[in-house]
Regions:
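Interhelical loop/hinge segments that connect adjacent transmembrane helices in multipass membrane
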Residues: 1-4, 8, 177-194, 207-247, ...
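Signature of the first transmembrane helix
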Residues: 4-68, 92-103, 126-128, 163, ...
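Interfacial/gating helices of multi-pass transporter permease domains
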Residues: 32-54, 119-120, 188-192, 228-232, ...
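Specific pore-lining/lateral-gate transmembrane helices of multi-pass inner-membrane transport
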Residues: 73-89, 271-383
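Transmembrane alpha-helical segments of multi-pass transport proteins
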Residues: 111, 188-191, 243, 386, ...
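Hydrophobic alpha-helical transmembrane segments
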Residues: 123, 152-215, 384-389, 403-424
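Membrane-interface junctions at transmembrane-helix termini in multi-pass inner-membrane proteins
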Residues: 131-154, 214-217, 354-385
Length: 466
C-alpha cells in the first residue's frame, strides 16, 4: 500500500468511525418508527425524505466539489478564505430565496404532493433543506482542513437532538398530554409531522453551533471568483440533480405506478423504504469513503500519482464492499428483525439493494478523474444516462412488480453508469485499474454468496443451532 493510499485509508477510518457512530444513532429511529407508525404513515416520511436530497443538491449547486477544487489550487490562506466566503455566500443566498418561495407557495406545493391537509409538512421540510444547505459549505471547509473532530461532533449533536426529540414526541408526549401535562404541544393529527419538527430543531442547532467554527469569515460573493466556481460546478449541479433522481425517484415512482390505490401504494413504499434502510452498512461505507476521498482526490497531484492512487483505491474499495455485501446478504433474515413485523416481507430484495449501493460507490471512484481535470461536463453524460435507465425501467417494471421492480430498475441504472463511466475514463483519462484482480475478487464473492444460498442460508443454520 502506497503512502498516499495509507493517508486516504487513515482519513477514511477517521470519518468511518464517526460516520458509523452517527448513522447508528440515527438508525435507531428505523426500528422505533416502524413500530409506532402505521405503514402508510412511514410511507409519508419516506416520500418526503426522498425529496430532501434532491432539493439539497439544487441549493448547494455543486459548490462543495467546487470549493474542494479551488481551495486545493489556492496559493495561500487568504485566497482559500475568499473561495470559502464566495461559495458559502452563493449557497446562502439561494437557500434564503428558496425558503421564501416555499412560504409563498406552501399550500400549492402541499396540494401537489398530496398533503393538502398538512401544509406544515411542506414549510418545515423547506426550512430543514434551507438550513442544511447553508451549513453544507462550512462542513466542506472542516473536511478540507482535516478538522474531522469538529465535523464529527457537530454531526453527532445533530443526530442526538433529532433522536431525543423523536423519542419524546412519539414515546413520552402522548402520555404526558393524556395526564394534562403539555396538552397544547400534542396533536394526534400531526402523525408523522413530529419527525419533521425534530429534524428542523436539529438542523437549527447545527447551524448555531457551526457558525463560530467559520474562522470569522462571513458569506460574501466575489463576482469574478463566483463565475469561475459556477463554470466548474454547474455541470456537477446538473449531474447531481440527475444522480439524486437516480437514487430517490424510485420511491416516487412506486407511489405513482403501484396499482391498488394510494393507500396501498403508500404501504408498499413504506416497506420498500424500510428495506433500503437495511442496506445502511454499505451506504455508510460509501459515505465515509466519499467524505475522505473527495477533498483528497480534488487536491493537487504530481505526474501520474492521481491515476495510480485512484486505481489502488478502487481495488480496496471493491474488496471491502464485497465483504459488506456477503455479511448482510447472507444474514439478511437476522437484519430483518430490526424492522417491525409488517415491514419484513420485502427483505428478500436486500441483495439487490446492496449491489446497487456497491455500484454507486464504484461510480463515485470513476468520477474523480473529470473532477480533477475540470472536465465536469462528463458528469452530466453519466448521470443523465442513468436517469434515463431509471425512468424507463421503473415504468416498465413497477406496475407489475411493485417495489421489486423499483429495486431492479436501480440496479440496472447503476450498472449502466458504471459501464459508461469506465468507457469515458478509458478514452480521456486512462486509470490503470487492475481488472484481472478485481474480476477475481468479484467472482470469489459471487461463489461464496451462491454457496450460502444453496446451503439454505446461514441464518437458517443459526436458527437450528440456537
Amino acid at each position: 500500500m502506497s503512502n498516499q493510499m495509507r493517508k486516504l485509508a487513515g482519513q477514511t477510518m477517521v470519518y468511518g468511525i464517526s460516520t458509523v457512530l452517527v448513522r447508528l444513532l440515527n438508525y435507531l429511529l428505523v426500528p422505533y418508527l416502524t413500530r409506532v407508525m402505521e405503514r402508510a404513515q412511514y410511507g409519508v416520511v419516506s416520500h418526503i425524505y426522498a425529496v430532501i436530497p434532491f432539493v439539497l443538491v439544487i441549493l448547494t449547486m455543486g459548490l462543495e466539489s467546487g470549493y474542494f477544487r479551488f481551495a486545493g489550487k489556492a496559493s495561500g490562506e487568504g485566497e482559500k478564505r475568499r473561495v470559502f466566503a464566495t461559495a458559502w455566500g452563493m449557497v446562502s443566498l439561494v437557500s434564503v430565496l428558496f425558503f421564501v418561495l416555499v412560504l409563498l407557495f406552501n399550500g400549492t406545493i402541499a396540494e401537489w404532493m398530496g398533503y393538502a391537509a398538512h401544509p406544515s409538512y411542506i414549510w418545515m421540510t423547506g426550512a430543514i433543506v434551507a438550513l442544511d444547505a447553508v451549513t453544507a459549505i462550512p462542513f466542506a471547509r472542516l473536511r478540507e482542513q482535516s478538522r474531522s473532530g469538529r465535523y464529527v461532533l457537530l454531526r453527532l449533536v445533530s443526530v442526538v437532538v433529532n433522536l431525543a426529540l423523536c423519542f419524546f414526541f412519539y414515546g413520552w408526549l402522548p402520555s404526558l398530554a393524556g395526564r394534562g401535562i403539555l396538552p397544547w404541544a400534542y396533536d394526534p393529527a400531526m402523525g408523522p409531522g413530529y419527525v419533521f419538527v425534530a429534524n428542523l430543531a436539529a438542523s437549527a442547532v447545527t447551524l448555531l453551533l457551526i457558525l463560530p467554527m467559520c474562522g470569522g469569515v462571513a458569506p460574501r460573493i466575489d463576482r469574478r471568483l463566483a463565475r469561475s466556481l459556477l463554470v466548474y460546478s454547474l455541470p456537477l449541479l446538473l449531474s447531481g440533480i440527475a444522480g439524486t433522481a437516480n437514487e430517490f425517484i424510485d420511491r416516487q415512482m412506486v407511489l405513482w405506478l403501484t396499482p391498488g390505490g394510494s393507500e396501498y401504494a403508500l404501504e408498499q413504499l413504506g416497506v420498500y423504504g424500510a428495506v433500503i434502510k437495511l442496506g445502511v452498512v454499505m451506504t455508510l461505507f460509501t459515505s465515509m469513503y466519499r467524505l475522505a476521498a473527495e477533498p483528497f482526490f480534488l487536491a493537487e497531484f504530481k505526474g501520474d500519482d492521481f491515476r495510480r492512487t485512484n486505481a489502488e483505491a478502487m481495488k480496496y474499495f471493491i474488496i471491502v464492499s464485497i465483504f459488506i455485501f456477503l455479511f448482510i446478504a447472507l444474514f439478511r433474515d437476522l437484519f430483518a428483525l430490526i424492522l417491525g413485523r409488517d415491514f419484513r416481507e420485502g427483505v428478500w430484495i436486500l441483495p439487490i439493494v446492496l449491489l446497487s449501493n456497491m455500484l454507486s460507490g464504484i461510480v463515485l471512484n470513476l468520477s474523480f478523474w473529470y473532477k480533477q481535470t475540470g472536465a465536469t461536463k462528463y458528469a452530466i453524460y453519466v448521470t443523465g444516462t442513468g436517469l434515463l435507465f431509471t425512468v424507463a425501467f421503473n415504468i416498465l417494471l413497477v406496475p407489475s412488480l411493485g417495489y421489486v421492480g423499483a429495486a431492479v430498475a436501480r440496479l440496472v441504472c447503476e450498472s449502466a453508469m458504471v459501464a459508461l463511466s469506465y468507457l469515458l475514463n478509458r478514452r480521456y483519462c486512462p486509470v490503470p485499474y487492475d481488472l484481472k484482480r478485481i474480476g477475481e475478487y468479484v467472482l470469489l464473492g459471487a461463489l461464496l454468496y451462491g454457496a450460502g444460498v444453496l446451503c439454505g442460508s446461514l441464518t437458517g443454520w443459526l436458527r437450528y443451532l440456537i
